[in-house]
């Protein structure tokens, strides 16, 4: 039986749907070493996902530590509710975006906390569920929304943006050098009929770039760019970071896990600027990366980078 806090703040998500949710938390040991959760501490996981990191934090903060978990994906919250149910009233789950982490935390009673975690990666469940449209490994609707109730999909961008704007978007959010060729190919294809599936878009991009050359699929960067744009990910990160600093007590820590250079650059520059201003102390001078063993077990951890800073 779920606690009342799940029912009140977790809103309308089904615990039964969590049975199919799978996601291996990356850099788990390193994240705990960075956050240093302790008994009785209050922590926020701004991207709670399936609850892997959150469960480890709750174990470390027993018997009376508290955790607020935030996620915009109802499937993720369902998984977190099921996984974290044994911790009862120590857990509060809220549906929302981490870009509003300050408001959501205050509303839930988490005004000053000992630590905040953001894991910015797309979960294995989201990647491996075809209808979510994040992957080109299967034919699926061109969606890519982390929040399934958000108004804009990748199909909207691909079919509606002017060619120049589409090229700029792809380059800005993926640094894809062939962005103009890709945009031209997309516009030519959509003039014949709307582009509606992931495999269709992947084939268009692959042809525009001359086919596959190496381990990485030619459409990988374009899919990344569209996902970032659909979910406004970089703007959300920019908005969240200063709010996190305000939530931390002196000595409290923020741990941010990124998965591409654009995110990591934002986090690195923010932490360095705040350290120079005397608001933060850098715990990781260089990003922490997954061990070779973790990369072998979980290949999706290869691009993960962890940065940690402490409130001064």
Swiss-Prot record:
InterPro entries: RsmH, SAM-dep_MeTrfase_MraW_recog, SAM-dependent_MTases_sf. GO terms for molecular function: rRNA (cytosine-N4-)-methyltransferase activity. Specifically methylates the N4 position of cytidine in position 1402 (C1402) of 16S rRNA. It comes from Roseiflexus castenholzii (strain DSM 13941 / HLO8). The gene is rsmH. This is Ribosomal RNA small subunit methyltransferase H. Its EC number is 2.1.1.199. It is found in: Cytoplasm. Pfam families: Methyltransf_5. Residues 289-312 are annotated as: Disordered. It is an enzyme of class 2 (transferase). Keywords: Cytoplasm, Methyltransferase, rRNA processing, S-adenosyl-L-methionine, Transferase. The keyword Methyltransferase applies. One of its GO terms (biological process) is rRNA base methylation. Belongs to the methyltransferase superfamily. RsmH family. Disulfide bonds: none annotated.
């Amino acid at each position: 039986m779920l606690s009342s806090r799940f029912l009140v703040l977790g809103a309308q998500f089904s615990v039964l749907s969590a049975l199919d949710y799978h996601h291996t938390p990356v850099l788990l040991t390193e994240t705990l070493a960075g956050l240093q959760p302790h008994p009785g501490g209050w922590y926020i996981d701004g991207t709670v996902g399936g609850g892997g990191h959150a469960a480890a934090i709750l174990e470390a903060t027993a018997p009376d530590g508290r955790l607020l978990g935030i996620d915009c994906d109802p499937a993720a919250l369902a998984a977190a509710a099921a996984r974290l149910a044994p911790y009862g009233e120590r857990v509060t789950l809220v549906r929302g975006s981490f870009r509003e982490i300050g408001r959501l935390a205050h509303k839930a009673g988490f005004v000053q906390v000992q630590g905040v975690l953001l894991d910015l990666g797309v979960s294995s469940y989201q990647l491996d569920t075809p209808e979510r449209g994040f992957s080109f490994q299967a034919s699926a609707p061109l969606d890519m929304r982390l929040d399934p109730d958000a108004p804009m999909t990748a199909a909207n961008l691909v079919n509606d943006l002017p060619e120049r704007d589409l090229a700029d978007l792809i380059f800005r959010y993926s640094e894809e050098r062939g962005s103009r060729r890709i945009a031209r190919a997309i516009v030519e294809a959509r003039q014949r009929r709307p582009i509606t599936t992931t495999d269709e878009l992947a084939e268009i991009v692959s042809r525009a770039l001359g086919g596959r050359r190496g381990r990485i699929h030619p459409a990988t960067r374009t899919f990344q760019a569209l996902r970032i744009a659909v979910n406004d990910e970089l703007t959300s990160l920019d908005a969240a970071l200063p709010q996190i600093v305000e939530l931390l007590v002196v000595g409290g820590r923020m741990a941010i896990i990124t998965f591409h250079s654009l995110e990591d650059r934002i986090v690195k520059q923010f932490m360095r600027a705040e350290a120079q201003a005397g608001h933060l102390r850098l715990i990781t001078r260089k990003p922490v990366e997954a061990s070779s063993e973790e990369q072998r077990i979980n290949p999706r951890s290869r691009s993960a980078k962890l940065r940690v800073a402490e409130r001064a």
